[in-house]
């Protein structure tokens, strides 16, 4: 939008792209600059003026987008830990050294109910570890397991949730 020949406005000239070209004089400008452009094709400018805020004869000053300062988290070089606990990826091998734990051991360690290592050995062929179906010899009907529950071999497969519920203490 050009304001040519109007009283109180500077005659604005535009280049081949429609951008205002400064005249160098700057008479009659109020010096108002702000966000939001009207009639300009880019930058932070004002309506039909070529400068603003004391910049005489310069056009197109300022960036294309306003980006507010980003507030960053700074901890002053101190690492902050979350509240979650983690288990070690290795354990004592009984010979004075360390051995790497498998996924099964890590999962067992996370489950409530204490150490299940002794109970798995006591169950023998009647059941397996967590997530494994018990494969017996077929002669284990009516035997008592480590928890005092009696298992009967009905040939019916248990669901995963039933197996987990069976392993949890206090659910019998």
Swiss-Prot record:
Swiss-Prot/TrEMBL Type B repeat ranges: 98-115, 156-172
Domain of life: Eukaryota
Record's compositionally biased regions (Low complexity): 140-153
Family per similarity comment: Belongs to the plant dehydrin family.
Protein name stated in the entry: Water stress-inducible protein Rab21
Induction: By abscisic acid (ABA) and water stress.
Amino acid composition bias (Basic and acidic residues), ranges on this chain: 154-172
Span list, region Disordered: 1-172
Alphabetically ordered keywords of this record: Cytoplasm, Repeat, Stress response
Tagged with keyword Transmembrane: no
Gly residues bias spans: 21-65, 124-139
A biological process term (GO) from this entry: response to water deprivation
Major place of residence: cytoplasm
Type A repeat coordinates: 3-28, 125-149
Record's subcellular location: Cytoplasm
Gene Ontology cellular component list: cytosol
Keyword Cytoplasm belongs to the record: yes
Pfam family, one: Dehydrin
